[in-house]
Amino acid sequence: DEPSDRRWTQTITTAGAVAELAFAIIDDHSLSISSRLVKPAPDGRDATAHLTFIPYPESPISFSDGSTAELSDDAWDKTGLTSFGHHNWNLTLPESARINWPVLPHNPYTDDGHAATEEARLVVSLPMSETPLSLKLTVQ
């Protein structure tokens, strides 16, 4: 597919692996994201794409299995889901995706580099293969 003002592809090369992330604007409220492993790493290691979201701490997460989770100091991760929602958006995803909270950054302003939960991110990890995996992000 040729890039356009509504569709583009990002190619990422790391550790000898080549991956593509393709983005397409569906409408004013929806974005399609797909990932594909173009070339595996020479040493056979797994490839994973990570999508990072800045959370709204006051908004709980709702999952396709009917459960919910708060964005607190308590860590959790979920797999086997087909979607989850947070604040004013919803993400459909393949069941192989993993959703993690909290993923803490390195904080260069603390002596030991630790970060507080207020700095945490919500991360969706997609195991990559030659078969494309697709997500759909919808903002209401």
Language model regions located:
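Extended, loop-rich substrate-binding clefts of extracytoplasmic carbohydrate-active enzymes
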Residues: 1-42
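Glutamate identity and glutamate-enriched acidic tracts
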Residues: 2, 20, 39, 58, ...
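Beta-strand-rich recognition/accessory modules
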Residues: 13-15, 47-49, 82-140
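Short, surface-exposed, charge-dense and proline/glycine-enriched linear segments
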Residues: 78-80
